[in-house]
């Protein structure tokens, strides 16, 4: 038998062999581990619907649940429960909702039904004053951090609105800020701030002391062009939303680029002015895609999963959504092992 014939015979596959190969591959696919199904109906997504002067609540699948708030704030004294361009929202461990009521230069607190509880802050500079605060986040110990954007500072308050701590001054030195916008926390309580007009991310410890920074202005991947939102994954990886560059960039804690996601557009996974981010306990990422008037949802590998929202004033619609906060049913989140 010739070498050519040997090669031909060796390369042949019988019907029985083909059937066995298909069966093997199918059984292998069935045995591949799959991510457990996450019931996002028990997760709640709170949106500061800035242009409609209200807070909207959805489940994690985008189902509208309810809303509260109305337009107000033409001049002080401002009416409790009314808003003027609310820009940030967070939910504390007790289920209370805190809103950075940016245009009224104050913070408002509501119960989980949207009933008004308290307010604090007036326009100005000082411990109990704000100037267009754009974001807010609840800490594990029951305190809240307010991003006092146009005062270039971060301020901590207790659950009664009493001032505890402030840090940040106008400037570009380490620990100084220039129009900070986004804020996030890691498991150790470290504070991550998007120092927007300084084109960088700054990290502070839980006492507000400067730790480190990274970032440099530019359009290339790895550089920053007006970073706005930030979120910290369970492993310490950082996701940064650049509203001027219409993309998300993923960095390690030292600022080394790991991944870039998105571009300008309206399709799934594209963005037009992404402003705020939130991560759920399972690693799903929610993005406020402001000019596209929608929320986009991504899985832990940053694959597009879902979206919801169109422009309008009806329940479930948006007009320039700005802030996002998450809460969930007791025992819904995974336990740390």
Tell me what each language-model feature is.
Residues 1-337:
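Eukaryotic scaffold repeat domains enriched in small/polar residues
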């Amino acid at each position: 038998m010739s070498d050519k014939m040997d090669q031909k015979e060796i390369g042949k596959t019988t019907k029985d062999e083909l059937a066995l190969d298909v069966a093997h591959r199918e059984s292998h696919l069935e045995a591949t581990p799959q991510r457990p199904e996450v019931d996002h109906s028990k997760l709640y997504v709170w949106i500061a619907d800035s242009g409609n002067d209200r807070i909207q609540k959805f489940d994690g699948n985008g189902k509208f649940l309810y809303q509260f708030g109305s337009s107000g704030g033409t001049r002080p004294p401002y009416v409790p429960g009314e808003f003027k361009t609310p820009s940030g929202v967070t939910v504390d461990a007790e289920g209370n909702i805190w809103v950075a009521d940016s245009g009224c230069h104050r913070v408002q607190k509501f119960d989980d039904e949207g009933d008004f509880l308290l307010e604090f802050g007036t326009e100005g500079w000082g411990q109990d004053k704000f100037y267009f605060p754009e974001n807010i986040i609840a800490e594990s110990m029951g305190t809240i951090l307010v991003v006092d954007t146009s005062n270039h500072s971060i301020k901590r308050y207790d659950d009664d609105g009493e001032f505890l701590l402030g840090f940040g001054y106008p400037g570009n030195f380490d620990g100084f800020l220039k129009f900070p916008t986004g804020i996030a926390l890691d498991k150790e309580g470290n504070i991550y701030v998007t120092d927007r007009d300084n084109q960088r991310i700054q990290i502070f410890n839980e006492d507000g002391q400067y730790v480190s920074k990274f970032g440099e202005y530019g359009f290339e991947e790895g550089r920053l062009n007006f970073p706005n939102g930030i979120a910290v994954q369970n492993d310490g990886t950082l996701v940064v939303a650049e509203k001027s560059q219409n993309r998300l960039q993923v960095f390690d804690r030292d600022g080394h680029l790991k991944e870039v996601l998105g571009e300008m557009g309206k399709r799934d996974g594209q963005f037009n002015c992404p402003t705020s981010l939130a991560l759920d306990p399972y690693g799903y990422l929610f993005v406020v895609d402001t000019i596209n008037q929608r929320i986009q949802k991504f899985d832990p590998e940053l694959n597009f999963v879902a979206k919801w929202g169109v422009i309008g004033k009806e329940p479930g619609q948006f007009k320039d959504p700005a802030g996002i906060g998450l809460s969930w049913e007791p025992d819904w989140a995974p336990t740390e092992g």
